[in-house]
Amino acid sequence: MVVSKFVQIRRDLHKIPEIGFKEWKTQRYILDYIGTLSNEHVEVKVWRTGVIVKVKGKNPEKVIGYRADIDGLPITEETGYEFASVHEGMMHACGHDLHTTIGLGLLTAAVTERIDDDLVFLFQPAEEGPGGALPMLESEELKEWKPNIILGLHIAPEYPVGTIATKEGLLFANTSELYVDLKGKGGHAAYPHTANDMIVAASHLVTQLQSVISRNVNPLDSAVITIGKITGGTVQNIIAEKSRLEGTIRTLSVESMSRVKSRIEGIVAGIEASFQCEAIIDYGAMYHQVYNHEALTREFMQFVSEQTDMKVITCTEAMTGEDFGYMLQEIPGFMFWLGVNSEYGLHHAKLKPDEEAIEKAIVFLDQYVKWKGTRK
C-alpha cells in the first residue's frame, strides 16, 4: 500500500508524541520539513518548543493565521498501529498529530501558490498543559507577525469524514484545573480517635463537591466538577496524614466559573473545620472559553457549504477545554470540529482517526484561505 505524503507525515509525528514544552523532536521534524520548502517568501521563527512561520503574500493587506497544537498526552497507546508511539507512556491521543500535519499541508499549498495576504502558521506547544497559547500570544516573536484573523481546528471522532461542525459564539467551555491538598494527623489504624483521617476527609470532600453543580449553578447553565485522581496513605494499617485530590472544573460562562470556585472554597473551609485539618487549593492552569467570532464563523460556514465538498453541521457548545480561547480573546477568528470517524474518543488509548480526513482538510482549507485572501 502506498500512502500519501501527508499521511506519512502524520504517521511520523504519531510515533514521537511529547508532552508540553518538551516537544523537541516534533519541533525538529517541523523545521526539517519547512526546510524542504525553501522559498524566499517564507520566514521562520522558533519560540520555545514551537514554530512560527510566515508566508509573505503578493500584495498583503491583512494577516491570516492558522494555529496547530503539537503536543501529545501521557497515555500508553493501545491502537495496534505499526507506527505506534515509540515514546513509552506517551501518545497522540487527541489528534494533534493530525492538526500539525494539516498545518504543514496548508503551508505547502501556500508556498506553492501564494495569495495576496500574508499567512502565519502557529505550531503551538503545550495545549494539553500547562498551556502554550497565551505565552505564545504574548511573545515578541508573534507580536511582529500578529494575525488579523485566526482559525484552528480540532478532530472530532464522532463526526464522519467529510464533515465539519462549528457554531457562532460559544463553542468550548471555560476550564480550570483543581488540586486540593489535605493535611491532618496520622496514627495507628486501631486508634482512630487519636488521629485525623485524611482519607475520610477526602471522601467527604468529593461527595460534597457534587452538590455545587446540582445546587449552586443555574440549571439553564452548565458546569462540571470531576475529581479524576485521589492519593493518600501509605499502608493498610496506618491512618493517612495527607491526601490529595486532582480534578477539573468546566463551565459555559465566566460567571459560573467564579461561582463554582467560590463554593469550592467554602466547602473546603468546612472540611477543614469538620476534620480539624489544613487544606490548600490550587487551580493550576485555566483556559478561557472558545468564543467564535459570529460574522467570520457564519461566513466560513457558508463558504464551506456552498463552495467545497465538505458537509457543514451546526453543533452545540461542548464542555471541552482549549487554550485557543486565549487567542480568540485577542484576535477575531473561529475554531471548528473536523470529522475523523473513530470508534474511540479523544484521550482514549485506542483513538484511531480516519486518515482520509487529512487531505480533505488540507484541500478545503486551502480553498478557504485562497478565497479569504482575496477579500478586503
From Swiss-Prot:
Pathway info: Amino-acid biosynthesis; L-lysine biosynthesis via DAP pathway; LL-2,6-diaminopimelate from (S)-tetrahydrodipicolinate (acetylase route): step 3/3
Signal peptide: none
Source species, domain of life: Bacteria
Annotated NCBIfam families: amidohydrolases
Membrane-spanning parts: none
One example GO MF annotation: N-acetyldiaminopimelate deacetylase activity
Enzyme Commission no: 3.5.1.47
Record PANTHER family: N-ACETYLDIAMINOPIMELATE DEACETYLASE, PEPTIDASE M20 FAMILY MEMBER
Biological role: Catalyzes the conversion of N-acetyl-diaminopimelate to diaminopimelate and acetate.
UniProt keyword terms in alphabetical order: Amino-acid biosynthesis, Diaminopimelate biosynthesis, Hydrolase, Lysine biosynthesis
CDD domains assigned: M20_Acy1_YkuR-like
Record protein name field: N-acetyldiaminopimelate deacetylase
Catalysed reaction, written as an equation: N-acetyl-(2S,6S)-2,6-diaminopimelate + H2O = (2S,6S)-2,6-diaminopimelate + acetate
GO biological process per UniProt: diaminopimelate biosynthetic process; lysine biosynthetic process via diaminopimelate
Family: Belongs to the peptidase M20A family. N-acetyldiaminopimelate deacetylase subfamily.
Catalytic machinery residues: 69, 128
